[in-house]
Amino acid sequence: KLIENYKDGSLVTRNDIFFSLCKSIIGQQISVVAANSVFLKFKKKCKGRINAKKVHALSSASLKSCGLSRLKVKGIKDLARKILKKSFKPDLIKKMSDEEAIEYLSELRQIGRWSAEMILLFTFNRSNIWPLQDIGLLRAISNNYKKKYFPPKSFLKKLNKKFTPYCSVATWYLWRSIDDEPIQY
């Protein structure tokens, strides 16, 4: 039913893990509008090209002036440093299972399970991501399946089983049902 309602758009990969991780860190625990505003300022500081070298060269004060918290600045600076020193190796993720990749990504500062799942879904186009910490997904499930918010765990497991191995696609369509703008990271 949802697929028929949202024929335009699709899951699109940016194929740039540094960009996506920065966007994920910036967007944590703030509204989409606030995240977009901060991200635009961040992008401007990077002169339109977001990469580890440019971000590493920026001062913490410069990053804070974009509206980033001290912890987010530390997370982004640490990520840039690890990419440049090659102590974080994104290419390894391609060979990992979803759970192994989530654990590996979660070793990064400011990256938890939810952020790791967003990276797997949007950057690596993994097909079976079911991000149950995502409030939007839980709200969409409640709306579309006439369940109370938070849907019962037993129901979430049933849906997971139904949508496997395409939970990522189901997630995307469920998100679309509550937000006309296709989500991208």
List the model feature ranges, each with a label:
Residues 124, 145-146, 178:
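Hydrophobic/aromatic-lined pockets within catalytic cores
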Residues 86-89, 103-104, 140, 144, ...:
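Long, compositionally biased
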Residues 22-23, 27, 60-64, 102, ...:
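Amphipathic alpha-helical segments within well-ordered protein domains
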Residues 134-149, 154-161:
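C-terminal end-helix/capping segment
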